[in-house]
A protein has these predicted regions:
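Alpha-helical adaptor scaffolds
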Residues: 6-72
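Long, contiguous interaction/recruitment modules in multidomain scaffold/adaptor proteins
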Residues: 1-5, 139
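Canonical tetratricopeptide repeat
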Residues: 45, 79, 113-114, 118
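Alpha-helical linker/edge segments of TPR/alpha-solenoid repeat scaffolds
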Residues: 92-95, 119-139
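Mid-chain, well-packed structural core segment of small domains
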Residues: 66-87
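Register position in tetratricopeptide repeats
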Residues: 18, 52, 86, 118-121, ...
Length: 139
């Protein structure tokens, strides 16, 4: 496929994702990921689909792959952070959110606001766990 055809397919896949047709969107992004293995966006999109379908391990793997290809992919960072949060990996989640916020110091990307909110929730979870820990563990 040519670049314009890949873009057209990606736009179709995104539209299907937005409409909640995750199985069809998944097929498109799996095909695109095979066609262009160096494009991080396709893996980020797959991760978002897996996340929406509650396939957290598959989502984590897709976001990891996306971030290997593009370490500055804020969508992959925020979404991977959410996966970590849902898996109970609070520190990993907080790190991903912090990296996403660092990538957008002027807070122009809507994902950054989401990252800030989720980071605050992660920190609150850590602080609540520390407050409720037995005194022996706090030493």
């Amino acid at each position: 496929m040519s670049s314009p055809e890949l873009l057209e397919r990606a736009m179709e896949g995104f539209r299907l994702y937005e409409e909640g047709d995750y199985p069809e969107a998944r097929l498109i992004f799996e095909e695109l990921a095979q066609q262009d293995p160096l494009e991080a966006y396709y893996r980020t999109a797959l991760g978002a689909i897996y996340l929406a379908e509650d396939e957290l391990d598959a989502a984590l793997e897709a976001f990891d792959e996306a971030l290997k290809l593009n370490p500055k992919d804020s969508a992959a960072l925020v979404n991977r952070g959410e996966v970590h949060l849902r898996l109970g990996n609070i520190m990993e989640a907080a790190q991903d959110f912090a990296r996403a916020v660092d990538l957008d110091p002027e807070n122009k990307d809507p994902l950054t606001m989401r990252a800030r909110l989720l980071a605050a929730a992660a920190i609150e979870t850590i602080e609540a766990a520390q407050r409720s820990a037995p005194a022996e563990l706090k030493k």
